[in-house]
Amino acid sequence: MSARTPYIGITGIVTAGDIHALRTLAWKAPPPFGYRWMAGVLVSAKTLAGGATTNARYPRFADVPALLEELGDDTRTWPVVHFNCREGLAGHLRTLAGLEAMRGLQLNVQNPDRGEVAAFKRDRPDVEFILQVNAAAADESGALTPDSIRRYIDRYDGVADFALVDASAGRGTAIDLAVA
C-alpha cells in the first residue's frame, strides 16, 4: 500500500444534479483535515458494453466520461470509477484506461488478477487503485478474519493504493466491526 491521501466515499453519481449536491456538500462540510471526498461513478461490464441496467445508480456508459471530467474540475472531489464484472477483466481494464478524467479505480471483483491490475497501473500510473476486500478474502471456514483480510491485501502489495473492507459486497449489510 502506498501512503496516499485517505478519503470519504460517496458513490452513485449519475447526474449533474448529483455532482451539484456533492459540490454543495464539499463546500459546506469539507472532509476532516487530511481527507478528501471520493466521488464514485458505478460502471459494470453490462453498462461498459452499452447495455442498460435497472439499477438507477449506474449511468449510461456514454455519460461516464463527462461525469468524470466535471468531477475532476473540482479540486475538492476525487473522481473514481467503481467497476464490476465476472469475466474479461483485462479487456475491460483496457477500455477503462481510456477514461482520461478517471483518477481512481475500485474493482468490485473477487480475486482480480494481480498481473492484469499491475498492467493497468503501468498504463495509468495517475490512477489510484482501490482493492475491494470482499468474500474472496474469507478463510477456509468462510469467515472474514483480520488474518484472512491481511493475506488477501498482501497479494496486491505494490499495486493497491487502498484496501476497502466491504464484506457486504455493496449490499449495505452490517459487518462485524471487530473484523473491520
Task: Please report, for each region that a protein language model flagged, where it lies by residue.
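SEC14/CRAL-TRIO lipid-binding/transfer domains and related phosphoinositide-recognition modules
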Residues: 3, 7-28, 46-62, 66, ...
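Hydrophobic faces of well-ordered beta-strands that scaffold small-molecule active sites
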Residues: 4-14, 31-50, 75-83, 103-107, ...
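Short linear motifs at secondary-structure transitions and domain/linker junctions
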Residues: 17, 52-59, 81, 104-107, ...
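Short, acidic/polar
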Residues: 19-25, 86-97, 141-155
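N-terminal cationic-hydrophobic initiation segments that often serve targeting/anchoring roles
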Residues: 23-26, 30, 68-72, 96-97, ...
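N-terminal active-site wall of soluble small-molecule enzyme domains
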Residues: 46-100, 111-116
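Conserved anion-binding
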Residues: 100-180
